[in-house]
Curated annotation (Swiss-Prot):
The gene is LSI2. This is Silicon efflux transporter LSI2. It is found in: Cell membrane. Signal peptide: none annotated. It comes from Oryza sativa subsp. japonica. The lineage of its organism: Eukaryota, Viridiplantae, Streptophyta, Embryophyta, Tracheophyta. Keywords: Cell membrane, Membrane, Transmembrane, Transmembrane helix, Transport. Constitutively expressed in roots. Localizes on the plasma membrane of the proximal side of both root exodermis and endodermis, where casparian strips exist (at protein level).
Amino acid sequence: MSELASAPKVALGSIAFAVFWMMAVFPSVPFLPIGRTAGSLLSAVLMVIFHVISPDDAYASIDLPILGLLFATMVVGSYLRNAGMFKHLGRLLAWKSQGGRDLMCRVCVVTALASALFTNDTCCVVLTEFVLELAAERNLPAKPFLLALASSANIGSAATPIGNPQNLVIAFNSKITFPKFLMGILPAMLVGMAVNMVMLLCMYWRELGGGAELSVDGKQMEAVEEGRSPASAKSTPQLNGNGNTMMSLEMSENITTKHPWFMQCTEARRKLFLKSFAYVVTVGMVVAYMVGLNMSWTAITTALALVVVDFRDAEPCLDTVSYSLLVFFSGMFITVSGFNKTGLPGAIWDFMAPYSKVNSVGGISVLSVIILLLSNLASNVPTVLLMGDEVAKAAALISPAAVTTSWLLLAWVSTVAGNLSLLGSAANLIVCEQARRAPRNAYDLTFWQHIVFGVPSTLIVTAVGIPLIGKI
């Protein structure tokens, strides 16, 4: 049983956490329009000032392995964009398209699979404008494709520890290996992706009629290859909390300091070598994850290998890192740790635990509803930080296998919960903002347009995926 701290400590800790929640959900409230990152830091400072957590404990609560993995993943993603990875994904979407329905299915499948490896937010940043172009060329409505992009990115990202930030937290806290995590959620992800795709086709069958294959404009492909980064990075706000935009900038071409071997090669050969190296090293990184090597140091090593072999000033690449996201996470770690020290989360869980056991259908249903609601009220990463250990402790009383199942269930539900509303995940907001600010074929995806599809999709996809969690 969890014991509550003193009444003043509980009250002050709750106030500090309420500030964090308010700024995470409403980052631009009129009376304090400081944004999510500053709001996270403010909450962390309040926890220390109110003596809810000591300064030493506050620093100790910052999870450096997670921050290191986030940082390295952003660097690797930047090099992959410059290597044309997303250009090829764009070509795959457009190649020999048989019409609007076929294109819809491609968007769902390609986005889901790419998000599992390159994070949901990255895929949404790069693919949104290209999807708008494809729809406009074929005289198809943009809304179904934007919904497909956002929802599939969230569903696909659930499959791996590197798909989204909350999965990173779960993987590190649970010590579940990359292969075990992948195989535990992959069946649910594949079925969920298919169900989501069928729902989109059913809801927009008439609108998706037509749209025969058209040739893909080379300039569009070039824009995708460049990640739309120089313009998009300035036109799209940093969206932190349960994701990041990871805007990229093209590597500077005016740096002439090169190894003599490179100077003997043509520029075309040099670029081909660097692109090939980026792909090979990234595959090696995934293989290292699969064999169980330390995820954080594997990603950092991969990032540094790309920096060294590029043999140019790394500052343009490092500038693409969303440092505000890393600061947001640091403040969030301190805030959640302080709130846990009040004993309030533990007391609430003690009340809910008897009804949320993972060895019964009713218990799993109750637990899933709690996770789904909290993920939309408090955001999914704080929900994972608050509930993870408590859920695992309760599952440990059942069996060791139940502990793994509980972590995987938390990963699945908290991620798919992001599809419930436009505010449910950063990926949704990125798609919305990118589409609204697109220089051509802009589209304003509203809250209500999203929720009409988001609510039934989230409930059904979550439900069909839960029985498949941990079955392999």
